[in-house]
Curated annotation (Swiss-Prot):
Record protein name field: TM2 domain-containing protein 3
TM stretches of this protein: 180-200, 216-236
Annotated localization: Membrane
Signal sequence annotation: 1-30
Extracellular side: 31-179, 237-247
Domain TM2: 183-231
Keyword vocabulary terms for this entry: Glycoprotein, Membrane, Signal, Transmembrane, Transmembrane helix
Main location as per UniProt: membrane
Cytoplasmic compartment segments: 201-215
Cellular component annotations (GO), alphabetically ordered: membrane
Residues bearing glycans: 87, 99, 139, 155, 169, 179
Length: 247
């Protein structure tokens, strides 16, 4: 028994000494633990400075390019497609020639298919507001009365057609007579006045429902009102209630 106890004590002492030796670092295992090498990650996203410096550049096309033909004759270009050295010292109504150049981006040729940068155009010496009405278009108004005394006028803005050349501003103000139609026919109104005027059909057709009701319940004013309306419509004195002209 004593021998066994002695062996246990010796084993405990050896175990204690072995543990102390290992903990002191001299008896550490010889395995080498490889440390992972940190590889620098490449940033695949551009920095904020680079992102702001990269911008999509868009080229804005001039407005006149929409009406300027490509590879056409220079003499047929619209006025907005060329720049001409005009002067106001010409004689009104006379034919005058001006030197012109095509605007940037406009390519044109002469009659021999040769590209031209400088060319001439001929036009009548007159300002744009002096052109005949067929050479410009105006903004029409439907808020005025066509049947009035004196005849009503209104102010509007007119623009010269693209192919017409003139001096001065191509957009100008103009005073026009009130002249618009709402779709009423003079022949229809006159026919209704002759045939059904006693029932006020002509007045109802023209949009004058109050007068139409008066004629309807008075049987055309016993025929007198009917005869008067036939005369007034025939001479154009009575027209549509909206103030428009007959077709």
């Amino acid at each position: 028994m004593d021998l066994m106890m002695a062996l246990k004590r010796v084993c405990r002492v050896l175990l204690f000494v072995t543990q102390m030796y290992v903990f002191s670092g001299r008896g550490s295992l010889s395995f080498e633990y490889s440390q992972p090498v940190a590889q620098p990650l490449k940033d695949t996203f551009p920095s904020s400075t680079t992102a702001t410096s990269i911008k999509a550049t868009t080229t804005k096309m001039p407005e006149y390019m929409e009406i300027c033909p490509s590879n056409g004759q220079c003499s047929r270009l619209a006025s907005d497609c060329m720049t001409c050295a005009t002067n106001y010292s010409c004689i009104y109504g006379k034919l005058v020639t001006f030197n012109c150049t095509a605007k940037n981006g406009v390519v044109c040729f002469d009659e021999n298919s040769q590209r031209q940068e400088y060319f001439t155009i001929s036009m009548a010496c007159q300002f744009c507001w002096q052109l005949p009405p067929s050479d410009y278009v105006c903004n029409l108004s439907s808020s005025c009365k066509t049947i009035s005394c004196p005849r009503q006028r209104y102010n509007t803005t007119c623009t010269v057609l693209d192919h017409v050349h003139c001096l001065g501003n191509r957009t100008f103000p103009k005073m026009l007579y009130c002249n618009w139609t709402g779709g009423y026919k003079w022949s229809t109104a006159l026919a209704l006045s002759i045939t059904l005027g006693g029932f006020g059909a002509d007045r109802f057709y023209l949009g004058q429902w109050r007068e139409g009701l008066g004629k309807l319940f008075s049987f055309g004013g016993l025929g007198i009102w009917t005869l008067i309306d036939v005369f007034l419509i025939s001479v154009g004195y009575v027209g549509p209630a909206d103030g428009s002209l007959y077709i």
